[in-house]
A protein has these predicted regions:
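C-terminal accessory subdomain/extension
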Residues: 126-245
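Active-site loop/helix belt of alpha/beta enzymes
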Residues: 1-4, 9-131, 192-194
C-alpha cells in the first residue's frame, strides 16, 4: 500500500500525464483504492519564459485541476527562481541544486556552482609558427606558442564538441582550448601565462569558467555537461561544516 501517490497532469509538455479532462476520473479511481494522499503535479515546458503563450496556457490548465487537490507540485528550478506565480505545496529543484545559471534571481542574487571539474597540466611544450595541435590540425599557431597538455578528454566527460577558444580556468588567469578534444587529453595555449607549468591546476568548469559558458562553446547546455562526467573520473566530495563554507 502506497502512503502517497503523485498524479501527473499533462498541461502542455506532452511527455507524460493525464490530460486535464481525464484528471477527475483518474483521481476518483485512486480514491476508490483508499489512496487519499494524492499530490497533483505537472511540468513547465518553457519556464525560462514566464510570459510566453505556452507558459500562460499551462498555468490556465493547472488552475483548472489544482483547486480540488489538497497538494500540488508544478515548479522546476527556473519557475521557482523566476517570476512564475503558482499555487503548490512542493517545488522540484534540479539544475539549481548544482548552482547552474537560470533566469535572473530576485534581488540580484546568484547561485554558486557546486561542481568543479578539475585537472592539472601534465606536459608543456613550445611549437613554432605554422605548427598545428591535435587531431586534424585544426588549431594552427600564429606565433611561437607554449602548449599545455591536460589529462582530461571526452572519455572523462569533457565535450568533444568544444571549439578552439573554449575557456579553461587557472590560478593565473584564463587560457583557451587549442585543438580538438581527444579521448584522454585536451591542449591549451598558455603562452601568455608563463607562470603555468607541469602540475599547475586547471578548472575545466566550476567557479570560472562557469559551466554554462563552456556549454555555449559546445553548442549544448550546462544540464547536459552535468550528466556527462564518466565513471572513470574520480569524485571528491566536500562536506559543508558551516554557513560560510
Amino acid at each position: 500500500q502506497f502512503e502517497q501517490v503523485w498524479l501527473k497532469c499533462d498541461t502542455g509538455m506532452h511527455r507524460l500525464g493525464f490530460i486535464p479532462d481525464e484528471i477527475t476520473s483518474a483521481r476518483s479511481r485512486l480514491t476508490a483504492l483508499s489512496l487519499s494522499d494524492i499530490v497533483m503535479m505537472s511540468h513547465f515546458a518553457d519556464a525560462e519564459a514566464p510570459d510566453s503563450a505556452l507558459t500562460e496556457r499551462q498555468l490556465l490548465r493547472w488552475g483548472q485541476v489544482i483547486d480540488a487537490a489538497p497538494a500540488g507540485s508544478f515548479s522546476n528550478s527556473a519557475a521557482t527562481t523566476g517570476q512564475i506565480a503558482t499555487t503548490e505545496s512542493w517545488v522540484r529543484l534540479g539544475y539549481s541544486m548544482y548552482g547552474g545559471s537560470l533566469v535572473a534571481l530576485p534581488g540580484g542574487y546568484s547561485l554558486k556552482p557546486v561542481m568543479q571539474f578539475e585537472s592539472r597540466i601534465a606536459s608543456v611544450r613550445w611549437i613554432d609558427v605554422g605548427e598545428s595541435v591535435g587531431y586534424g590540425g585544426r588549431w594552427v599557431a600564429r606565433r611561437r606558442s607554449r602548449i599545455a597538455t591536460i589529462p582530461a578528454g571526452y572519455g572523462d566527460g569533457y565535450p568533444r564538441a568544444a571549439r578552439d577558444g573554449t575557456p579553461i580556468g587557472t590560478e593565473k588567469g584564463t587560457v583557451l582550448l587549442a585543438g580538438k578534444v581527444s579521448m584522454d587529453m585536451i591542449t591549451a595555449d598558455i603562452t601568455d601565462l608563463p607562470a603555468l607549468d607541469v602540475g599547475s591546476p586547471v578548472t575545466l568548469w566550476g567557479d570560472s569558467p562557469y559551466i554554462d559558458e563552456v556549454a555555449g562553446y559546445c553548442d549544448t547546455i550546462g544540464y547536459e555537461l552535468c550528466t556527462r562526467i564518466t565513471q572513470r573520473t574520480p569524485r571528491l566530495f566536500h562536506r559543508l561544516t558551516g554557513e560560510r563554507d
